[in-house]
């Protein structure tokens, strides 16, 4: 054999003899190197079962004979080291497959990702043209990364992994998105991408800007956190009303007042724009101006100031037509915005679904906003969550409450009867006061109270009747939300009854003034005729026209109606502010500073702090808006005054509610949709339209004031414009459309369409309710399945724990069994282990057990391991030599 082959054989023998890690761990003891090799060569053939008597005999025999001549301490150390090595080897064997799999998975992922990134990076860096397949691959990867960026928030990953994946995806998109523009359209693609990013950023900034521009948002949120959503709903409604009135003010101010002031005839040029001679002395007195007389009466705030010229100024602006169309637009825009708001609220309330399930769980685990970084905001959020819990508790208590239904019905009937008596009495009182004021208007010297008796009585009724209604409503025992609706309806009936009583009495005054205007009209014509035709014989120059202040004029009933609505608005505003100042602020100051020196607890007893009157304030706002809609046609400046009133009311009432009021004793949640307020407002809008439509269509305008003077009816300006400014065929079309034979069928068709849509809406709502019940039933079934499954898992885990505890007890008892046997037992084991050729005396002790002491135990295999461990026992062969036999 050549030397090279010998060297290869030697290397092979060395490599074959080189022990593995597993073999070295088993051969850790000084004397078991040969045993490890024999254990590998001789597998377990007919090895005894664990726990059998044969195995115990072999363990004891090998243990005693193999350790003769060694000290017990060395044996124990070797046994402990052997056990530790075997345990570590088993752990490595178990953990190695998992580690190998993870390593393979990571390497595969790197190999899959590495070629793409390197190829893309090289192609992008070198600037080479990409093929269509590569472009498609890049586009696909970029789209996937973009999709991951948009959906990473919904992934069920830990936050660290989300951030890592998000950064990697953003870096990938920024790096390789430009590779798509390497062809002809590189600059165009880069420009489009830049503009798209800038547009997204602009929309985001604009949305943030719109959110910041919402007026009084933080004030309302602060109020909601302390007083609940029911009080905040009033301020949201007030803000909405302010926006509507701001639009109406823009229409009237921009299309009526400004054109008349800039292009119309100046003040003092005609009688309707001049203060009469008899009123000039006291025209600037405060008492006169407070009553909207003097110079205010003959200003652009009222109907009578505007001229009846068909066109004014160099623009030939048609002011009468603009005045009429703006009046129609006020009602049209208000009707459209109210119905649109109601529709949006209805859609929002139906899209929410059934949120009554798990109310407290949802509030507990999903109420907090983790983006809050301000301590004050956190305090407000804490108070808001507490208030929402109180609202839900009240709803839960009211849904489970039971009582005597017969007593409740009797008390509710009694309460409604008392409130009906109050409504009838207030209506009669207002009618009586208006009739009395007509008598006072004929007198010369009247007091301030007699001049303003109507406004004072109506304001006092609006101030004292709502608390009286609230006291009577305590008998009905309604849910707070239902009680609020009843209270709103009753106060609405009070205000509406008072308003229509006032209008009926005012219409009597209007008819009286119309009859007087005919006389004044004749007197004016004869006066001017005599003035111009009575000239002396020696006069050669004609007389100049009379001064506008000296011309007789009529009563101008439109301006009188506008003045009455202006007085009502201002007096209602002042009474509201005085009520807040005296009834809330001064009351709160008295309770706070006099409580420590009073006979009883002022905070807990009488008078205590005031609660915010939601129903009274809401109905006052709606009632005031109804007066604005009716009076704006006769007083264009009334909308501007109402805008100032709403603006000051927002700040004044926000300050009052935060400084002087306390939350309601029973805090309740407002309705999901604000449609109850909107429904009342829509009804007021319709009822406000009726008097204005009656005056426009039926009553003749004043002959010497206003843009419609000289016409039989106010709507004649529409016919005049159509005849003079439009082609004739359009006039025929408008005349055909105004035919009652066409209008009545159109109205009937509208009613049929409304009925059909209402029936469809009800059927859809019923289907929605049925689907909601089915979803609830499926949820209950799923919950029951989960509970049954959870119980089964708990039962199985308990059984497993019991079985494992029993096994552990058995193992513990086996380990703690004594190893000191009687001499006869040890001798019997030694005989069986040594074979038939070894003799021993009966009753004598074996020489190998001379060192055996209590507490020592023979080596055993691990009972908890999954694989059988090889152990070596020492015995004697039939020839008498010591041999080693593996036992698996």
Swiss-Prot record:
Pore-forming subunit of the mechanotransducer (MET) non-selective cation channel complex located at the tips of stereocilia of cochlear hair cells and that mediates sensory transduction in the auditory system. The MET complex is composed of two dimeric pore-forming ion-conducting transmembrane TMC (TMC1 or TMC2) subunits, several auxiliary proteins including LHFPL5, TMIE, CIB2/3 and TOMT, the tip-link PCDH15, and possibly the PIEZO subunits. One of its GO terms (cellular component) is plasma membrane. Residues 7-16, 32-44, 87-110 have a biased composition (Basic and acidic residues). Inner ear and testis. Expressed in cochlear inner and outer hair cells and vestibular organ hair cells. Residues 117-128, 836-851, 866-881 have a biased composition (Polar residues). The gene is Tmc2. Residues 1-228, 351-406, 476-479, 595-613, 661-674, 776-888 are cytoplasmic. Residues 267-317, 438-447, 515-556, 635-637, 699-741 are extracellular. It is a multi-pass membrane protein. Forms the MET channel composed of TMC dimer (TMC1 or TMC2), TMIE, TOMT, CIB (CIB2 or CIB3), LHFPL5 and PDH15. The interaction of TMC1 and TMC2 with TOMT is required for the transportation of TMC1/2 into the stereocilia of hair cells. Interacts (via N-terminus) with both isoforms CD1 and CD3 of PCDH15. Can form a heterodimer with TMC1, TMC5 or TMC7. Disruption phenotype: Knockout mice show reduced transduction current amplitudes in inner hair cells relative to wild-type. Keywords: Cell membrane, Ion channel, Ion transport, Membrane, Transmembrane, Transmembrane helix, Transport. This is Transmembrane channel-like protein 2. It is found in: Cell membrane. It catalyses: Ca(2+)(in) = Ca(2+)(out). InterPro entries: TMC (IPR038900), TMC_dom (IPR012496).
């Amino acid at each position: 054999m050549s030397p090279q082959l010998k060297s290869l054989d030697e290397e092979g023998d060395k490599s074959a003899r080189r022990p593995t890690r597993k073999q070295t761990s088993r051969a850790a003891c000084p004397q078991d190197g040969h045993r490890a090799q024999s254990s590998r060569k001789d597998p377990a053939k007919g090895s005894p079962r664990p726990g059998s008597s044969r195995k115990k005999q072999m363990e004891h025999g090998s243990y005693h004979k193999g350790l003769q001549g060694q000290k017990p301490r060395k044996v124990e150390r070797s046994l402990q080291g052997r056990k530790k090595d075997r345990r570590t080897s088993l752990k490595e064997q178990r953990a190695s497959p998992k580690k190998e799999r993870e390593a393979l998975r990571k390497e595969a992922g790197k190999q899959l990702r590495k070629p793409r990134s390197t190829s893309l990076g090289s192609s992008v860096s070198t600037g080479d043209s990409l093929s269509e397949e590569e472009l498609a691959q890049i586009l696909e990867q970029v789209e996937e990364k973009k999709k991951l960026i948009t959906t990473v928030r919904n992934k069920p990953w830990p936050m660290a992994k989300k951030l890592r994946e998000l950064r990697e995806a953003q870096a990938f998109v920024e790096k390789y998105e430009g590779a798509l523009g390497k062809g002809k359209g590189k600059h165009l693609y880069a420009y489009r991408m830049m503009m798209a990013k800038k547009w997204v950023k602009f929309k985001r900034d604009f949305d943030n800007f719109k959110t910041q521009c919402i007026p009084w948002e933080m004030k309302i949120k602060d109020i909601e956190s302390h007083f609940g959503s029911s009080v905040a709903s009033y301020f949201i409604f007030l803000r909405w009303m302010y926006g509507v009135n701001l639009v109406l003010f823009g229409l009237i101010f921009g299309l009526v007042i400004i054109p008349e002031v800039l292009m119309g005839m100046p003040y003092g040029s005609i009688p309707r724009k001049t203060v009469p001679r008899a009123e000039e002395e006291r025209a600037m007195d405060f008492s006169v101006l407070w009553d909207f007389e003097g110079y205010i009466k003959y200003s652009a705030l009222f109907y009578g100031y505007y001229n009846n010229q068909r066109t004014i100024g160099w623009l030939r602006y048609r002011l009468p037509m603009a005045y009429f169309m703006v009046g129609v637009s006020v009602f049209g825009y208000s009707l459209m915005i109210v119905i649109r708001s109601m529709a949006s609220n209805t859609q929002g309330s139906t899209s929410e679904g059934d949120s009554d399930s798990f109310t407290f769980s949802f509030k507990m685990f999903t109420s907090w906003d983790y983006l809050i970084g301000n301590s004050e905001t956190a305090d407000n959020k804490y108070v808001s969550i507490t208030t929402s819990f109180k609202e839900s508790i009240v709803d839960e208590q009211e849904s489970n409450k039971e009582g005597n239904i017969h007593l409740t019905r009797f008390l509710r009937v009694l309460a409604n009867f008392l409130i009906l008596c109050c409504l009838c009495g207030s209506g009669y009182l207002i009618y009586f006061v208006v009739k009395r004021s007509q008598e006072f208007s004929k007198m010369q010297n009247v007091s301030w109270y007699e001049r303003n008796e109507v406004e004072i009585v109506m304001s006092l009724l609006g101030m004292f009747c709502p608390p009286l209604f609230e006291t009577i409503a305590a008998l009905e025992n309604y849910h707070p939300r239902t009680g609020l609706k009843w209270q709103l309806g009753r106060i609405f009936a009070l205000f509406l009854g008072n308003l229509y009583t006032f209008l009926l009495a005012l219409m009597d005054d209007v008819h009286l003034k119309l009859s007087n205007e005919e006389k004044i009209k004749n007197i004016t014509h004869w006066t001017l005729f005599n003035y111009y035709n009575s000239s002396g014989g020696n006069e050669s120059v004609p007389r100049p026209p009379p001064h506008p202040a000296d011309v007789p004029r009529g009563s101008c009933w439109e301006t009188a109606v506008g003045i009455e609505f202006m007085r009502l608005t201002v007096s209602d505003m002042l009474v509201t502010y005085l009520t807040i100042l005296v009834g809330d602020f001064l009351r709160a100051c008295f309770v706070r500073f006099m409580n420590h020196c009073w006979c009883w607890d002022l905070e807990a007893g009488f008078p205590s702090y005031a609660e915010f009157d939601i129903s009274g304030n809401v109905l006052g706002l709606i009632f005031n808006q109804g007066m604005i809609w009716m009076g704006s046609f006769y007083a264009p400046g009334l909308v501007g005054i109402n805008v100032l009133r709403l603006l000051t009311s927002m700040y004044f009432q926000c300050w009052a509610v935060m400084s002087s009021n306390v939350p309601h004793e029973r805090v309740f949640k407002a309705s999901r949709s604000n449609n109850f307020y909107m429904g009342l407002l829509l009804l007021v809008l319709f009822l406000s339209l009726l008097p204005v439509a009656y005056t426009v269509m039926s009553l003749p305008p004043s002959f010497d004031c206003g843009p419609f003077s000289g016409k039989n009816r106010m709507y004649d300006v529409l016919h005049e414009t159509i005849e003079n400014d439009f082609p004739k065929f359009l006039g025929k079309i408008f005349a055909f459309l105004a035919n009652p034979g066409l209008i009545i069928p159109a109205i009937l068709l509208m009613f049929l369409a409304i009925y059909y849509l209402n029936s469809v809406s009800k059927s859809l709502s019923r289907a929605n309710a049925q689907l909601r019940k089915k979803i609830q039933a499926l949820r209950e079934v799923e919950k029951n399945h989960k509970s049954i499954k959870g119980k089964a898992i708990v039962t199985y885990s308990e059984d497993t724990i019991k079985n494992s505890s029993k096994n552990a007890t058995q193992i513990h008892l086996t380990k703690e069994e004594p190893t000191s046997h009687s001499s006869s037992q040890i001798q019997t084991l030694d005989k069986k282990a040594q074979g038939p050729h070894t003799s021993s005396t009966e009753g004598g002790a074996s020489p190998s057990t001379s060192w055996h002491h209590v507490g020592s135990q023979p080596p055993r295999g691990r009972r908890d391991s999954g694989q059988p461990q090889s152990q070596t026992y020492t015995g004697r062969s039939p020839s008498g030599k010591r041999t080693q036999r593996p036992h698996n």
